[in-house]
């Protein structure tokens, strides 16, 4: 009796296995299902400066661009006076350094202008202008943000420096080697958690944004240098100098300080 029950309950009759349920491959066949995110495609820019075939500004020089030069890094004889883009590997490294330093300079120029704008808007900030900040930071108890000593308990500039080293080291480590933020595809433009706004979804807009980033970053690096020189000479921030110049363009300009070799006076 037990043997008969076993025979009935087993999924094989007369030595042939009976299929209880079809496999997944039989149900779906050989079709492939792919899912992708639908992103609205933005039209490529009509700007002559940021498109792929950008106008070369150095028309008088030799117009034949080198093979390594893209639209963003014109390597004509006049553009790369120091021959920094002579070797392709060096050009790639220089482009990486330019993008990283340009992003930093864009943030720095925004911060220098924003601090001056906040001071102009009568928000009482205890921090000095961009010019005098380095001297004030080394003094003890100088890093009281927004004039409230209880807001940030980091009165030591060395403690702030150590925290910055740890935090930026961790972020840069994830950017280069991957980690909990996702795998690394391109270390210079990591994407994923590093791109919360999704600016790199559309490849055409992304290529145009890369060019704009490098061009605006070069402008920001040069303008930050100008802010420093202005602050050393005049002792004022960039917005104060702009307001003074607009108030009296004839007297308040660079020539008024060109004969003044004592900084800050």
Curated annotation (Swiss-Prot):
The UniProt keywords, alphabetically, are: Chlorophyll, Chloroplast, Chromophore, Magnesium, Membrane, Metal-binding, Phosphoprotein, Photosynthesis, Photosystem I, Photosystem II, Plastid, Thylakoid, Transit peptide, Transmembrane, Transmembrane helix
The GO terms this record gives for MF are: chlorophyll binding; metal ion binding
Q: Which processes are annotated in GO (biological process)?
A: photosynthesis, light harvesting in photosystem I; response to light stimulus
GO CC entries: chloroplast thylakoid membrane; photosystem I; photosystem II
Chain positions recorded as chlorophyll a 3 binding sites: 213
Q: Which residues bind chlorophyll b 2?
A: 152, 181
Query: Any idea what job this protein has?
Result: The light-harvesting complex (LHC) functions as a light receptor, it captures and delivers excitation energy to photosystems with which it is closely associated.
- Positions with a binding annotation for chlorophyll b 5: 164, 261
Q: Where in or outside the cell?
A: Plastid, Chloroplast thylakoid membrane
Q: Where are the transmembrane segments?
A: 151-171, 219-239
Kindly give the InterPro entries that the UniProt entry links to this protein: Chloro_AB-bd_pln, Chloroa_b-bind
List the source organism: Solanum lycopersicum (Tomato)
Q: Where does chlorophyll a 4 bind?
A: 216
Alphabetized Pfam families for the sequence: Chloroa_b-bind
Q: Where is the transit peptide?
A: 1-34
Q: Does the keyword Protease apply?
A: no
According to the record's subunit comment, the protein's assembly and interactions are: The LHC complex consists of chlorophyll a-b binding proteins.
Q: Where does chlorophyll b 3 bind?
A: 156, 172
Q: Give the source's domain of life in one word.
A: Eukaryota
Protein name as catalogued: Chlorophyll a-b binding protein 1C, chloroplastic
Q: Provide the binding site for chlorophyll a 6.
A: 245, 254
Residues recorded as binding chlorophyll b 4, renumbered to this chain, are 164, 175
């Amino acid at each position: 009796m037990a043997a008969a029950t076993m025979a009935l309950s087993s999924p094989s009759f007369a030595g042939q296995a009976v299929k209880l349920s079809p496999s997944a491959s039989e149900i779906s066949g050989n079709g492939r299902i792919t899912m992708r995110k639908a992103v609205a495609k933005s039209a490529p820019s009509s700007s002559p400066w940021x498109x792929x075939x950008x106008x070369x500004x150095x028309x008088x020089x030799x117009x034949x661009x080198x093979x390594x030069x893209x639209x963003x890094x014109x390597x004509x004889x006049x553009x790369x006076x120091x021959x920094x883009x002579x070797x392709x590997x060096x050009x790639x490294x220089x482009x990486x350094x330019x993008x990283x330093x340009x992003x930093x300079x864009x943030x720095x120029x925004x911060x220098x202008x924003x601090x001056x704008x906040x001071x102009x808007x009568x928000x009482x900030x205890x921090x000095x202008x961009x010019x005098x900040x380095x001297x004030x930071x080394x003094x003890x108890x100088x890093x009281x943000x927004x004039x409230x000593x209880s807001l940030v308990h980091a009165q030591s500039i060395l403690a702030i420096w150590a925290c910055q080293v740890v935090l930026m080291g961790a972020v840069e480590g994830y950017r280069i080697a991957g980690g909990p933020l996702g795998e690394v595809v391109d270390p210079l433009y990591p994407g994923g958690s590093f791109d919360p706004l999704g600016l790199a979804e559309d490849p055409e807009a992304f290529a145009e944004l890369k060019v704009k980033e490098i061009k605006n970053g070069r402008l920001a690096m040069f303008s930050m240098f100008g802010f420093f020189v202005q602050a050393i000479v005049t002792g004022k921030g960039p917005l104060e100098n702009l307001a003074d110049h607009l108030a009296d363009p004839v007297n308040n300009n660079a020539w008024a300080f060109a004969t003044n070799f004592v900084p800050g006076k």
